[in-house]
């Protein structure tokens, strides 16, 4: 058994269900010939370097699989006939592979990917909790600052009458002075 990679570009205007049918057809073909799909990666719609069958964009898909050489001829024949596929390329990546070793390698890669996703999720959760804590602290500081400003705003209002009283006192003093002039005369 050999290991292959096939990349094909399908029509980007295909409806999602039609595209899914095409992908299932390719995966089923590999399974029919006792092959094993290591991974099936959809890259999505991308701009093509040049027009292919009057299309400027294509939907890219990468398949990594193990199979016998007879499958490749049949798969390429089907890809040439199918109008939904714009272009394809198949390369052999390994001459002889142990299917159990490939399955183990794929399982290990999946476990590492899941662990990385779990670690990323935990890190995101920790960052979210820290952001919430910082927001709560900021809100508490703002409330505390507002509480300090409120009594300070009330205090000048109480001091204002005291400031008016000295202003009245000098006004009374000149009134007394003329009285003292009359008494002297």
From Swiss-Prot:
A molecular function (GO) term: small ribosomal subunit rRNA binding
CDD domains the UniProt entry points to: bS6 (cd00473)
Pfam families on file: Ribosomal_S6
Region of interest: Disordered: 115-185
TM segment ranges: none
Source species, domain of life: Bacteria
Biological process (GO), any one: translation
CC per GO annotation: cytoplasm; ribonucleoprotein complex; ribosome
Chain intervals with Acidic residues compositional bias: 170-185
Keyword Ribosomal protein assigned: yes
Keywords: Ribonucleoprotein, Ribosomal protein, RNA-binding, rRNA-binding
Feature: compositional bias, Low complexity: 142-169
Composition-biased stretches (Basic and acidic residues): 115-141
HAMAP family per UniProt: Ribosomal_bS6 (MF_00360)
NCBIfam families: S6
Function: Binds together with bS18 to 16S ribosomal RNA.
Family, as annotated: Belongs to the bacterial ribosomal protein bS6 family.
Protein name: Small ribosomal subunit protein bS6
Provenance organism: Desulfatibacillum aliphaticivorans
Lineage: Bacteria, Pseudomonadati, Thermodesulfobacteriota, Desulfobacteria, Desulfobacterales
């Amino acid at each position: 058994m050999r290991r292959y990679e096939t990349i094909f570009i399908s029509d980007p205007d295909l409806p999602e269900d039609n595209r899914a049918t095409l992908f299932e057809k390719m995966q089923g073909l590999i399974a029919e010939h006792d092959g094993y799909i290591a991974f099936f990666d959809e890259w999505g719609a991308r701009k093509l370097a040049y027009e292919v069958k009057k299309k400027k964009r294509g939907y890219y898909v990468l398949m990594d699989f193990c199979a016998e050489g007879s499958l490749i001829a049949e798969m390429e024949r089907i890809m040439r006939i199918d109008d939904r596929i714009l272009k394809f390329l198949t390369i052999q990546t390994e001459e002889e592979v142990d299917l159990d070793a490939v399955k183990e390698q794929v399982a290990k890669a999946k476990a590492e990917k899941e662990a990385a996703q779990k670690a990323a999720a935990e890190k995101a959760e920790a960052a979210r909790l820290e952001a919430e804590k910082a927001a709560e602290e900021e809100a508490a500081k703002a409330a505390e600052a507002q509480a300090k400003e409120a009594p300070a705003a009330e205090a000048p209002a109480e001091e204002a009458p005291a400031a008016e009283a000295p202003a009245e006192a000098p006004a009374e003093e000149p009134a007394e002075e003329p009285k003292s002039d009359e008494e002297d005369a």
